[in-house]
Amino acid sequence: MLYRFWKTGLAIFMPGCILLSSCSFRSYIPTPSLRNTVGNHNSYVNNTVPKNNFYEKFYDLTFALNFTNQKTQEFGTGWLIDWKGDETKDLNTLTIASSSIISSVSNHSLKEKQDDKLFIAYIATNLHLIDGLKNDHDYQPYNKDGNGLSFPFDQKTQSFLLGRFANPKINSKPEEMNYQVQTRLKQDAMVFIQTSTLPKTAYAGIDPINFDYHETSDESGFWTKKQSTANFPRTRTLKSYADFAVLEVPLFLDNANDAKIYQEWIRPAVQAYKELGDVENIFAKTPYAEYINNTYYLLGYPVTNNNKYQFILGQDEKWKFSQQTSVLKHYQKQPLQQRTVYVERDDGLPTLTFNEDKLTHVQGTDLINVDQITDTNLGNGLINYAGLSRFTLSYHNVEYKLFGYGTILNNTNFPGGSSGSAVFNKEKQLTSIYFGSLINVTTGNNRNVNLGLGQILRTYNTNNSKHSAPSSYDLIFGDKNTIKFYAQFAKEKQTHLWNKIQTSVNSSISFYKDKK
Protein backbone atom coordinates (compact mmCIF):
# COMPACT_ATOMS: atom_id res chain seq x y z
CA MET A 1 0.00 0.00 0.00
CA LEU A 2 1.23 3.45 -0.89
CA TYR A 3 1.16 6.22 1.65
CA ARG A 4 0.16 9.35 -0.16
CA PHE A 5 1.73 12.70 0.54
CA TRP A 6 1.41 16.00 -1.25
CA LYS A 7 3.85 18.89 -1.44
CA THR A 8 2.83 22.52 -1.62
CA GLY A 9 6.39 23.39 -2.12
CA LEU A 10 7.73 24.63 1.13
CA ALA A 11 5.35 25.38 3.94
CA ILE A 12 6.91 28.31 5.76
CA PHE A 13 6.36 28.16 9.51
CA MET A 14 6.71 31.08 11.91
CA PRO A 15 6.59 30.08 15.59
CA GLY A 16 6.06 32.64 18.31
CA CYS A 17 4.57 35.52 16.37
CA ILE A 18 1.76 36.29 13.98
CA LEU A 19 2.22 37.26 10.37
CA LEU A 20 1.93 40.98 9.67
CA SER A 21 2.72 41.85 13.27
CA SER A 22 5.92 43.74 13.96
CA CYS A 23 8.11 40.66 14.23
CA SER A 24 11.11 39.65 12.19
CA PHE A 25 10.71 37.49 9.12
CA ARG A 26 13.76 35.56 10.33
CA SER A 27 11.36 33.58 12.51
CA TYR A 28 9.98 31.74 9.51
CA ILE A 29 11.13 28.13 9.22
CA PRO A 30 10.76 26.38 5.86
CA THR A 31 9.67 22.75 6.02
CA PRO A 32 8.81 20.52 3.05
CA SER A 33 5.06 20.13 3.40
CA LEU A 34 4.69 16.39 3.09
CA ARG A 35 1.17 16.09 4.46
CA ASN A 36 -1.33 13.26 4.61
CA THR A 37 -4.20 15.73 4.48
CA VAL A 38 -5.55 17.57 1.49
CA GLY A 39 -6.71 21.12 0.97
CA ASN A 40 -10.26 22.34 0.72
CA HIS A 41 -11.59 24.21 -2.25
CA ASN A 42 -10.67 27.87 -2.01
CA SER A 43 -12.41 30.85 -3.58
CA TYR A 44 -10.78 30.30 -6.96
CA VAL A 45 -12.22 28.79 -10.13
CA ASN A 46 -11.47 25.08 -10.44
CA ASN A 47 -12.44 22.03 -12.51
CA THR A 48 -13.05 24.32 -15.48
CA VAL A 49 -10.90 24.36 -18.60
CA PRO A 50 -10.30 28.08 -19.32
CA LYS A 51 -11.44 29.22 -22.74
CA ASN A 52 -10.99 32.58 -24.45
CA ASN A 53 -9.57 34.25 -21.36
CA PHE A 54 -6.26 35.21 -19.77
CA TYR A 55 -5.58 31.70 -18.47
CA GLU A 56 -6.18 29.71 -21.65
CA LYS A 57 -2.54 29.60 -22.80
CA PHE A 58 -1.30 29.00 -19.25
CA TYR A 59 -3.54 25.92 -19.13
CA ASP A 60 -2.15 24.61 -22.41
CA LEU A 61 1.38 25.04 -21.07
CA THR A 62 0.82 23.37 -17.69
CA PHE A 63 0.72 19.75 -16.46
CA ALA A 64 0.24 17.82 -13.24
CA LEU A 65 3.16 15.60 -12.25
CA ASN A 66 3.08 12.33 -10.30
CA PHE A 67 6.07 10.38 -8.95
CA THR A 68 5.63 7.03 -7.20
CA ASN A 69 8.05 4.84 -5.27
CA GLN A 70 7.59 1.83 -2.98
CA LYS A 71 6.29 3.95 -0.11
CA THR A 72 4.88 7.23 -1.36
CA GLN A 73 3.56 9.15 -4.28
CA GLU A 74 4.00 12.86 -4.77
CA PHE A 75 2.06 15.34 -6.87
CA GLY A 76 3.22 18.63 -8.29
CA THR A 77 2.83 21.00 -11.22
CA GLY A 78 5.11 21.66 -14.19
CA TRP A 79 5.10 23.61 -17.46
CA LEU A 80 6.73 23.27 -20.86
CA ILE A 81 9.98 25.25 -20.99
CA ASP A 82 11.70 23.67 -24.00
CA TRP A 83 11.67 20.73 -26.40
CA LYS A 84 13.71 18.78 -28.92
CA GLY A 85 12.17 17.24 -32.00
CA ASP A 86 9.79 18.11 -34.79
CA GLU A 87 6.90 19.87 -33.06
CA THR A 88 5.08 20.30 -36.37
CA LYS A 89 4.58 16.55 -36.79
CA ASP A 90 0.84 15.82 -36.70
CA LEU A 91 0.29 12.18 -35.78
CA ASN A 92 -3.29 12.36 -36.98
CA THR A 93 -2.01 12.69 -40.54
CA LEU A 94 0.88 10.23 -40.24
CA THR A 95 0.99 6.46 -40.12
CA ILE A 96 3.86 5.06 -38.09
CA ALA A 97 5.44 2.14 -39.89
CA SER A 98 3.95 -1.21 -39.09
CA SER A 99 6.07 -3.92 -37.52
CA SER A 100 6.08 -5.88 -40.79
CA ILE A 101 7.61 -2.96 -42.65
CA ILE A 102 10.12 -2.26 -39.90
CA SER A 103 11.24 -5.88 -39.81
CA SER A 104 12.23 -5.73 -43.48
CA VAL A 105 14.68 -2.82 -43.23
CA SER A 106 18.32 -2.93 -42.26
CA ASN A 107 19.49 -2.47 -38.68
CA HIS A 108 20.90 0.96 -39.55
CA SER A 109 17.63 2.09 -41.11
CA LEU A 110 15.73 0.65 -38.16
CA LYS A 111 17.78 2.76 -35.76
CA GLU A 112 17.10 5.90 -37.82
CA LYS A 113 13.38 5.15 -37.92
CA GLN A 114 13.19 4.50 -34.18
CA ASP A 115 15.34 7.50 -33.26
CA ASP A 116 13.20 9.71 -35.47
CA LYS A 117 10.20 8.73 -33.36
CA LEU A 118 11.69 10.33 -30.24
CA PHE A 119 10.34 13.71 -29.12
CA ILE A 120 11.67 15.18 -25.88
CA ALA A 121 9.64 17.59 -23.75
CA TYR A 122 11.40 19.62 -21.06
CA ILE A 123 9.13 20.38 -18.12
CA ALA A 124 10.04 23.04 -15.53
CA THR A 125 9.07 22.56 -11.89
CA ASN A 126 10.49 22.95 -8.36
CA LEU A 127 13.77 21.50 -7.16
CA HIS A 128 12.13 20.19 -4.01
CA LEU A 129 9.61 18.27 -6.13
CA ILE A 130 12.18 16.46 -8.28
CA ASP A 131 13.92 15.35 -5.11
CA GLY A 132 11.29 12.62 -5.53
CA LEU A 133 12.91 11.53 -8.82
CA LYS A 134 15.49 8.85 -8.03
CA ASN A 135 16.43 7.15 -11.27
CA ASP A 136 19.59 5.03 -11.67
CA HIS A 137 19.57 5.93 -15.38
CA ASP A 138 19.46 9.69 -14.72
CA TYR A 139 22.24 11.99 -15.86
CA GLN A 140 25.24 12.28 -13.58
CA PRO A 141 25.39 13.39 -10.80
CA TYR A 142 21.61 13.03 -10.32
CA ASN A 143 21.69 9.22 -10.67
CA LYS A 144 23.08 9.02 -7.12
CA ASP A 145 22.51 10.96 -3.95
CA GLY A 146 24.54 14.06 -3.11
CA ASN A 147 27.17 11.93 -1.38
CA GLY A 148 27.71 9.70 -4.40
CA LEU A 149 25.77 6.77 -2.93
CA SER A 150 23.15 4.68 -4.69
CA PHE A 151 19.54 5.30 -3.75
CA PRO A 152 17.86 2.76 -1.44
CA PHE A 153 15.50 0.52 -3.39
CA ASP A 154 12.37 1.73 -1.60
CA GLN A 155 13.21 5.33 -2.61
CA LYS A 156 13.75 4.62 -6.30
CA THR A 157 11.09 5.97 -8.63
CA GLN A 158 8.76 3.22 -9.82
CA SER A 159 6.43 5.20 -12.05
CA PHE A 160 5.92 8.67 -13.48
CA LEU A 161 2.74 10.13 -14.97
CA LEU A 162 1.82 13.39 -16.63
CA GLY A 163 -1.65 14.75 -15.94
CA ARG A 164 -4.16 17.29 -17.09
CA PHE A 165 -7.81 18.10 -16.43
CA ALA A 166 -9.27 17.24 -19.82
CA ASN A 167 -11.48 14.88 -21.79
CA PRO A 168 -9.94 11.38 -21.77
CA LYS A 169 -10.67 10.90 -25.50
CA ILE A 170 -10.54 7.12 -25.22
CA ASN A 171 -12.20 4.88 -27.80
CA SER A 172 -11.84 1.56 -25.94
CA LYS A 173 -14.88 -0.29 -24.73
CA PRO A 174 -15.80 0.52 -21.12
CA GLU A 175 -15.63 -3.10 -19.97
CA GLU A 176 -12.03 -3.32 -21.18
CA MET A 177 -10.96 -0.58 -18.80
CA ASN A 178 -13.11 -1.23 -15.77
CA TYR A 179 -15.38 1.75 -16.34
CA GLN A 180 -18.56 1.93 -14.30
CA VAL A 181 -20.41 4.43 -16.46
CA GLN A 182 -19.76 4.73 -20.17
CA THR A 183 -20.84 8.37 -20.26
CA ARG A 184 -17.79 9.31 -18.18
CA LEU A 185 -15.72 8.85 -21.34
CA LYS A 186 -17.35 12.04 -22.60
CA GLN A 187 -16.75 14.06 -19.42
CA ASP A 188 -13.73 16.09 -18.40
CA ALA A 189 -11.74 14.34 -15.69
CA MET A 190 -8.31 14.47 -14.07
CA VAL A 191 -6.45 12.42 -16.68
CA PHE A 192 -3.06 10.89 -15.85
CA ILE A 193 -1.02 9.14 -18.56
CA GLN A 194 1.96 6.97 -17.74
CA THR A 195 4.90 7.59 -20.06
CA SER A 196 6.90 4.72 -21.49
CA THR A 197 10.10 5.59 -19.61
CA LEU A 198 11.16 7.44 -16.48
CA PRO A 199 12.17 11.09 -16.91
CA LYS A 200 15.65 12.44 -16.30
CA THR A 201 16.95 15.61 -14.67
CA ALA A 202 17.88 18.20 -17.29
CA TYR A 203 18.63 20.92 -14.74
CA ALA A 204 18.61 21.12 -10.96
CA GLY A 205 19.03 24.50 -9.27
CA ILE A 206 21.78 23.37 -6.87
CA ASP A 207 24.94 25.47 -6.50
CA PRO A 208 23.96 27.78 -9.40
CA ILE A 209 25.81 30.91 -8.25
CA ASN A 210 29.39 31.85 -7.53
CA PHE A 211 28.69 32.24 -3.80
CA ASP A 212 28.51 30.01 -0.72
CA TYR A 213 26.62 30.55 2.52
CA HIS A 214 28.24 30.32 5.95
CA GLU A 215 25.81 29.36 8.70
CA THR A 216 26.57 30.66 12.19
CA SER A 217 25.27 29.62 15.60
CA ASP A 218 23.30 32.85 16.03
CA GLU A 219 21.53 32.25 12.66
CA SER A 220 22.84 35.48 11.18
CA GLY A 221 24.95 33.84 8.46
CA PHE A 222 26.80 35.45 5.56
CA TRP A 223 27.77 34.85 1.94
CA THR A 224 31.20 34.84 0.28
CA LYS A 225 32.41 34.28 -3.25
CA LYS A 226 33.66 30.78 -3.93
CA GLN A 227 37.13 32.11 -4.75
CA SER A 228 37.55 33.46 -1.22
CA THR A 229 40.50 31.91 0.63
CA ALA A 230 39.41 33.23 4.02
CA ASN A 231 38.89 30.78 6.85
CA PHE A 232 35.60 30.95 8.75
CA PRO A 233 35.83 28.91 11.96
CA ARG A 234 32.71 27.83 13.82
CA THR A 235 30.58 28.06 10.70
CA ARG A 236 28.94 25.49 8.44
CA THR A 237 29.30 26.13 4.72
CA LEU A 238 26.28 25.44 2.50
CA LYS A 239 26.05 25.68 -1.25
CA SER A 240 23.19 27.68 -2.74
CA TYR A 241 19.99 26.51 -4.35
CA ALA A 242 17.07 27.94 -6.27
CA ASP A 243 13.74 26.12 -6.13
CA PHE A 244 13.78 25.54 -9.87
CA ALA A 245 14.47 22.44 -11.95
CA VAL A 246 13.75 20.99 -15.39
CA LEU A 247 12.72 17.42 -16.22
CA GLU A 248 13.58 15.67 -19.47
CA VAL A 249 10.52 13.66 -20.53
CA PRO A 250 11.20 11.40 -23.55
CA LEU A 251 8.21 10.52 -25.70
CA PHE A 252 8.54 7.59 -28.11
CA LEU A 253 5.93 8.13 -30.78
CA ASP A 254 5.52 4.42 -31.50
CA ASN A 255 4.23 4.01 -27.94
CA ALA A 256 0.49 4.69 -27.68
CA ASN A 257 0.65 6.64 -24.41
CA ASP A 258 3.63 8.77 -25.44
CA ALA A 259 2.02 9.48 -28.79
CA LYS A 260 -1.21 10.55 -27.05
CA ILE A 261 0.70 12.91 -24.74
CA TYR A 262 2.58 14.40 -27.68
CA GLN A 263 -0.43 14.83 -29.95
CA GLU A 264 -3.07 16.01 -27.47
CA TRP A 265 -1.01 17.84 -24.83
CA ILE A 266 2.49 18.74 -25.99
CA ARG A 267 1.58 20.14 -29.39
CA PRO A 268 -0.96 22.59 -27.86
CA ALA A 269 1.65 23.46 -25.22
CA VAL A 270 4.20 24.25 -27.94
CA GLN A 271 1.65 26.43 -29.72
CA ALA A 272 0.86 28.30 -26.49
CA TYR A 273 4.58 28.75 -25.79
CA LYS A 274 5.07 30.35 -29.19
CA GLU A 275 1.99 32.56 -28.87
CA LEU A 276 3.25 33.78 -25.47
CA GLY A 277 6.37 35.08 -27.18
CA ASP A 278 8.58 32.02 -27.59
CA VAL A 279 12.07 32.04 -26.08
CA GLU A 280 12.69 35.71 -26.89
CA ASN A 281 9.78 37.08 -24.88
CA ILE A 282 8.23 34.50 -22.56
CA PHE A 283 10.80 34.91 -19.75
CA ALA A 284 10.44 38.27 -18.01
CA LYS A 285 13.51 40.18 -16.92
CA THR A 286 11.81 42.97 -15.01
CA PRO A 287 13.35 45.77 -12.92
CA TYR A 288 12.32 45.35 -9.31
CA ALA A 289 10.23 48.53 -9.27
CA GLU A 290 8.02 47.15 -12.03
CA TYR A 291 7.04 44.15 -9.91
CA ILE A 292 5.25 46.29 -7.36
CA ASN A 293 2.36 47.56 -9.47
CA ASN A 294 1.87 44.46 -11.56
CA THR A 295 -0.77 41.72 -11.35
CA TYR A 296 0.11 38.03 -11.10
CA TYR A 297 -1.65 35.02 -12.58
CA LEU A 298 -1.27 31.47 -11.30
CA LEU A 299 -2.61 28.16 -12.62
CA GLY A 300 -1.75 24.77 -11.20
CA TYR A 301 -2.93 21.43 -9.82
CA PRO A 302 -3.23 21.58 -6.01
CA VAL A 303 -4.58 18.45 -4.36
CA THR A 304 -8.02 19.14 -2.89
CA ASN A 305 -11.22 17.33 -1.99
CA ASN A 306 -12.82 16.89 -5.36
CA ASN A 307 -16.05 15.49 -6.77
CA LYS A 308 -14.54 14.77 -10.17
CA TYR A 309 -13.17 11.47 -11.39
CA GLN A 310 -9.60 10.42 -12.07
CA PHE A 311 -8.70 8.51 -15.20
CA ILE A 312 -5.34 6.70 -15.24
CA LEU A 313 -4.05 5.47 -18.58
CA GLY A 314 -1.39 2.88 -17.75
CA GLN A 315 1.34 1.48 -19.97
CA ASP A 316 0.57 -1.34 -22.38
CA GLU A 317 2.72 -4.34 -21.48
CA LYS A 318 2.75 -5.32 -25.15
CA TRP A 319 4.96 -2.36 -26.11
CA LYS A 320 8.44 -3.67 -26.87
CA PHE A 321 11.16 -1.51 -25.37
CA SER A 322 14.18 -2.07 -27.63
CA GLN A 323 17.60 -1.73 -26.01
CA GLN A 324 19.39 -1.97 -29.35
CA THR A 325 19.41 1.65 -30.48
CA SER A 326 21.71 4.36 -29.19
CA VAL A 327 18.77 6.50 -28.07
CA LEU A 328 16.57 3.97 -26.31
CA LYS A 329 19.34 2.42 -24.25
CA HIS A 330 19.83 5.65 -22.29
CA TYR A 331 16.35 5.54 -20.75
CA GLN A 332 14.73 3.25 -18.22
CA LYS A 333 11.41 1.59 -18.91
CA GLN A 334 8.94 2.34 -16.14
CA PRO A 335 9.48 -0.33 -13.44
CA LEU A 336 5.85 -0.29 -12.32
CA GLN A 337 3.19 -0.39 -15.01
CA GLN A 338 0.03 1.30 -13.79
CA ARG A 339 -3.38 -0.21 -14.50
CA THR A 340 -5.70 1.61 -16.85
CA VAL A 341 -8.68 2.52 -14.71
CA TYR A 342 -11.35 5.14 -14.14
CA VAL A 343 -11.68 5.77 -10.39
CA GLU A 344 -13.48 7.98 -7.93
CA ARG A 345 -11.16 9.02 -5.10
CA ASP A 346 -12.17 10.12 -1.64
CA ASP A 347 -8.68 11.06 -0.41
CA GLY A 348 -8.04 14.11 -2.55
CA LEU A 349 -7.31 14.71 -6.20
CA PRO A 350 -5.12 17.14 -8.17
CA THR A 351 -7.53 19.90 -9.10
CA LEU A 352 -7.11 22.34 -11.96
CA THR A 353 -7.20 25.72 -10.22
CA PHE A 354 -6.46 29.27 -11.34
CA ASN A 355 -6.62 32.49 -9.36
CA GLU A 356 -9.85 33.91 -10.72
CA ASP A 357 -12.39 34.62 -7.99
CA LYS A 358 -15.46 32.40 -8.30
CA LEU A 359 -17.89 35.13 -7.27
CA THR A 360 -16.43 38.39 -8.54
CA HIS A 361 -14.51 36.86 -11.47
CA VAL A 362 -11.60 39.16 -10.67
CA GLN A 363 -8.50 37.62 -12.21
CA GLY A 364 -5.00 37.62 -10.76
CA THR A 365 -3.56 38.95 -7.53
CA ASP A 366 -1.18 41.65 -6.32
CA LEU A 367 1.92 41.48 -4.17
CA ILE A 368 1.35 41.77 -0.42
CA ASN A 369 1.94 45.13 1.25
CA VAL A 370 4.53 44.28 3.89
CA ASP A 371 4.96 47.66 5.57
CA GLN A 372 4.06 46.08 8.90
CA ILE A 373 6.85 43.51 8.75
CA THR A 374 10.04 44.99 10.16
CA ASP A 375 12.67 43.16 8.19
CA THR A 376 15.14 44.54 5.67
CA ASN A 377 14.77 41.39 3.56
CA LEU A 378 11.28 42.47 2.52
CA GLY A 379 9.95 45.43 0.64
CA ASN A 380 6.83 46.11 -1.39
CA GLY A 381 5.96 42.45 -1.74
CA LEU A 382 9.43 41.28 -2.77
CA ILE A 383 11.59 39.07 -0.60
CA ASN A 384 15.36 38.56 -0.46
CA TYR A 385 15.81 34.89 0.38
CA ALA A 386 19.58 35.28 0.74
CA GLY A 387 19.19 37.00 4.10
CA LEU A 388 16.82 34.45 5.63
CA SER A 389 19.01 31.91 7.37
CA ARG A 390 16.37 29.21 7.88
CA PHE A 391 15.42 28.86 4.24
CA THR A 392 17.29 25.61 3.55
CA LEU A 393 16.41 22.45 1.65
CA SER A 394 17.73 18.90 1.49
CA TYR A 395 18.06 17.63 -2.07
CA HIS A 396 19.30 14.05 -2.50
CA ASN A 397 20.47 14.04 1.13
CA VAL A 398 22.58 17.22 0.96
CA GLU A 399 21.46 20.50 2.53
CA TYR A 400 21.48 23.75 0.54
CA LYS A 401 20.68 27.41 1.32
CA LEU A 402 18.06 29.28 -0.68
CA PHE A 403 19.21 32.43 -2.45
CA GLY A 404 17.66 34.96 -4.80
CA TYR A 405 14.59 37.15 -4.85
CA GLY A 406 10.95 36.21 -4.72
CA THR A 407 7.39 37.43 -4.90
CA ILE A 408 4.91 37.33 -1.99
CA LEU A 409 1.49 36.83 -3.58
CA ASN A 410 -1.49 38.16 -1.68
CA ASN A 411 -4.55 35.94 -1.15
CA THR A 412 -2.80 32.90 -2.61
CA ASN A 413 -3.16 29.72 -0.61
CA PHE A 414 -2.81 27.04 -3.27
CA PRO A 415 -2.35 23.80 -1.27
CA GLY A 416 -0.22 20.70 -1.90
CA GLY A 417 0.36 19.75 -5.52
CA SER A 418 0.70 23.33 -6.78
CA SER A 419 4.49 23.30 -6.43
CA GLY A 420 6.12 24.30 -9.68
CA SER A 421 3.27 26.41 -11.09
CA ALA A 422 4.36 29.25 -13.35
CA VAL A 423 3.60 32.80 -12.18
CA PHE A 424 2.80 35.19 -15.04
CA ASN A 425 2.43 38.98 -15.02
CA LYS A 426 -0.21 41.02 -16.83
CA GLU A 427 2.07 41.17 -19.87
CA LYS A 428 1.75 37.35 -20.01
CA GLN A 429 5.42 36.89 -19.25
CA LEU A 430 6.74 34.27 -16.87
CA THR A 431 8.20 36.04 -13.83
CA SER A 432 8.69 33.39 -11.15
CA ILE A 433 7.91 29.83 -10.11
CA TYR A 434 5.54 29.13 -7.22
CA PHE A 435 6.95 26.92 -4.48
CA GLY A 436 4.90 27.27 -1.31
CA SER A 437 2.77 29.29 1.06
CA LEU A 438 3.12 30.85 4.50
CA ILE A 439 1.79 28.98 7.51
CA ASN A 440 1.08 30.46 10.96
CA VAL A 441 1.69 27.79 13.60
CA THR A 442 0.90 29.95 16.63
CA THR A 443 -2.77 28.99 16.37
CA GLY A 444 -2.00 25.31 16.93
CA ASN A 445 -3.58 24.17 13.67
CA ASN A 446 -1.06 25.42 11.11
CA ARG A 447 -3.45 27.98 9.65
CA ASN A 448 -2.66 29.10 6.13
CA VAL A 449 -2.43 32.88 5.96
CA ASN A 450 -3.12 33.21 2.24
CA LEU A 451 0.36 34.30 1.16
CA GLY A 452 2.16 32.44 -1.62
CA LEU A 453 5.86 32.48 -2.47
CA GLY A 454 7.53 32.51 -5.85
CA GLN A 455 11.19 32.33 -6.90
CA ILE A 456 12.11 34.97 -9.49
CA LEU A 457 14.03 33.29 -12.32
CA ARG A 458 15.83 36.28 -13.86
CA THR A 459 16.87 39.54 -12.20
CA TYR A 460 18.52 42.82 -13.07
CA ASN A 461 21.54 44.16 -11.24
CA THR A 462 20.58 45.85 -8.00
CA ASN A 463 22.49 47.39 -5.14
CA ASN A 464 19.94 46.81 -2.38
CA SER A 465 21.33 43.50 -1.11
CA LYS A 466 22.76 43.81 2.40
CA HIS A 467 24.08 40.26 2.57
CA SER A 468 26.99 40.18 0.09
CA ALA A 469 24.97 37.70 -1.95
CA PRO A 470 24.82 38.14 -5.72
CA SER A 471 22.82 41.17 -6.73
CA SER A 472 21.76 39.58 -10.02
CA TYR A 473 21.30 36.11 -11.45
CA ASP A 474 19.70 34.39 -14.42
CA LEU A 475 18.67 30.75 -14.05
CA ILE A 476 17.63 30.47 -17.70
CA PHE A 477 20.33 32.20 -19.76
CA GLY A 478 23.07 32.93 -17.22
CA ASP A 479 24.89 36.11 -16.22
CA LYS A 480 28.13 37.12 -14.52
CA ASN A 481 27.06 35.63 -11.18
CA THR A 482 25.33 32.48 -12.43
CA ILE A 483 27.63 29.56 -13.10
CA LYS A 484 24.99 26.86 -13.63
CA PHE A 485 21.89 27.64 -15.67
CA TYR A 486 19.46 25.84 -17.97
CA ALA A 487 20.79 27.15 -21.31
CA GLN A 488 24.02 25.20 -20.76
CA PHE A 489 22.06 21.96 -20.94
CA ALA A 490 20.03 23.29 -23.88
CA LYS A 491 23.27 23.97 -25.76
CA GLU A 492 24.60 20.48 -25.06
CA LYS A 493 21.37 18.86 -26.33
CA GLN A 494 20.75 21.37 -29.16
CA THR A 495 17.17 22.03 -28.09
CA HIS A 496 14.63 24.54 -29.36
CA LEU A 497 15.68 27.08 -26.72
CA TRP A 498 19.32 26.88 -27.76
CA ASN A 499 18.46 27.23 -31.45
CA LYS A 500 16.53 30.40 -30.62
CA ILE A 501 19.46 31.79 -28.63
CA GLN A 502 21.69 31.22 -31.65
CA THR A 503 19.46 33.13 -34.05
CA SER A 504 17.93 35.80 -31.82
CA VAL A 505 18.90 39.48 -31.91
CA ASN A 506 17.52 39.92 -28.39
CA SER A 507 20.62 40.59 -26.29
CA SER A 508 18.88 39.67 -23.02
CA ILE A 509 18.76 35.99 -24.01
CA SER A 510 22.15 35.76 -25.76
CA PHE A 511 24.56 36.74 -23.00
CA TYR A 512 26.08 33.27 -22.87
CA LYS A 513 25.45 32.04 -26.39
CA ASP A 514 29.17 31.88 -27.22
CA LYS A 515 30.28 30.62 -23.82
CA LYS A 516 30.42 27.14 -22.35
Swiss-Prot record:
CC annotations in GO: plasma membrane
Transmembrane segments: none
Lipid moiety-binding region (N-palmitoyl cysteine): 23
Record localization: Cell membrane
Lipid modification (S-diacylglycerol cysteine), residues: 23
Signal sequence segment: 1-22
Membrane topology, record value: Lipid-anchor
Keywords for the protein's UniProt record, in alphabetical order: Cell membrane, Lipoprotein, Membrane, Palmitate, Signal
Similarity comment: Belongs to the MG067/MG068/MG395 family.
Protein name: Uncharacterized lipoprotein MG067
Organism of provenance: Mycoplasma genitalium (strain ATCC 33530 / DSM 19775 / NCTC 10195 / G37)
